[in-house]
Amino acid sequence: MAVSAITGARLTLGMSLSSSTRSRTVAMAVSIDPKTDNKLTLTKSEEAFAAAKELMPGGVNSPVRAFKSVGGQPIVIDSVKGSRMWDIDGNEYIDYVGSWGPAIIGHADDQVLAALGETMKKGTSFGAPCLLENTLAELVIDAVPSIEMVRFVNSGTEACMGALRLARAYTGREKIIKFEGCYHGHADPFLVKAGSGVATLGLPDSPGVPKAATFETLTAPYNDTEAIEKLFEANKGEIAAVFLEPVVGNAGFIVPKPDFHSFLRKITKENNTLLVFDEVMTGFRLSYGGAQEYFGITPDITTLGKIIGGGLPVGAYGGRRDIMEKVAPAGPMYQAGTLSGNPLAMTAGIETLQRIKEPGTYEYLDKITGELVEGIIEAGKRAGHAICGGHIRGMFGFFFTEGPVYNFADAKKSDTAKFARFFWGMLAEGVYLAPSQFEAGFTSLAHTSDDIKKTIAAAEKVFREI
């Protein structure tokens, strides 16, 4: 196994062992019928999804859940606990999606549920300040190097919207730089060469986004320092902020090259531009202080979500005090939210952060995730597949391509049709992966060595079959 130059970021690079022609289409329509192509009984899920499509656009409330990029129809979940989930047909799965990242201590944790029960006795929403906001704010500020003040919101999208408005208000500039394949929520200015569901659907952006909304958004390939230099040269004194996922999770799992973050920190300082780390996914996931602590780079503004709400809707943005004091009511930059700082999300966040602060958390996540990724990659190579992948702590991913993968263009070389077959094969073996090649996976403290062994055994079987 190859080890990247980034400490702790293990990258396993598989060589091509197959001469078969592979599809390069990002949003390939894969024809799969779970009734014939899989061993699962999904009758109730099929009925529920058919009804859902008459009630909600596409039958879901977030596009990737519809299984568009893997074909077939989605499973409908009944319950979750620990590392497991059960669909309404009674099928059990080892879960590596973790509600797309929040479930770092496992699903439906007893301590979190008990704390939520006590909080609910006092009410579910106040629309006024509560002490729980102070407690979670103190935990976040103590943990994250860049954050001296924090504002809670209700989603990662809201957090990035707030950070964008704040960066523009603070600098008096309008242009921003984002990276191809990086996803910062569904706000108009960010839907330019975006990742996550946009990548899954194969859309370069989204209909309904006016040109004016994205006119000030500049893009560059991830890990491409030369492209960034050219953008700064061509837009001197105009760039308010550089936004990035410090580790990409919304175009698959892509790590930064060793000097990429330090380059961005240097060039932004030289140009009086703010550096914004979107740590909605990596915050409290790569270390207790997030990716910025892990890599030793301090941005000006950080966005958070997922883990800080312990599975409830939440988001946050924070940064240096002089920047954050621009936010109303301390300053002139307006942003508000009816349910921001609600007691339930604050409670779940407090319980979760206190748990993962305990010694050994990240060492354990690194150990089990490393075993998982190594096992899957080695099984794929033995079966003759081109595959590469890697992990940092409890975040991982793999691509059906020779690799290495340093940006979205590299990621799009992955054989998405093969991924779809692998996804359904693993699902039939009781393993739930993200239903898209272009999403990262997650482990939790609830995952056991036995879970990892079962998953690798399932992968070995599926790789032989596909």
UniProtKB/Swiss-Prot annotation:
GO terms for biological process: chlorophyll biosynthetic process; protoporphyrinogen IX biosynthetic process. One of its GO terms (molecular function) is glutamate-1-semialdehyde 2,1-aminomutase activity. SUPFAM superfamilies: PLP-dependent transferases. It is an enzyme of class 5 (isomerase). Its cofactor is pyridoxal 5'-phosphate. This is Glutamate-1-semialdehyde 2,1-aminomutase, chloroplastic. Homodimer. It comes from Glycine max. Pathway: Porphyrin-containing compound metabolism; protoporphyrin-IX biosynthesis; 5-aminolevulinate from L-glutamyl-tRNA(Glu): step 2/2; Porphyrin-containing compound metabolism; chlorophyll biosynthesis. Its EC number is 5.4.3.8. InterPro entries: 4pyrrol_synth_GluAld_NH2Trfase, Aminotrans_3, Aminotrans_3_PPA_site, PyrdxlP-dep_Trfase, PyrdxlP-dep_Trfase_major, PyrdxlP-dep_Trfase_small. The modification N6-(pyridoxal phosphate)lysine is found at residue 306. Residues 1-28 form a transit peptide.
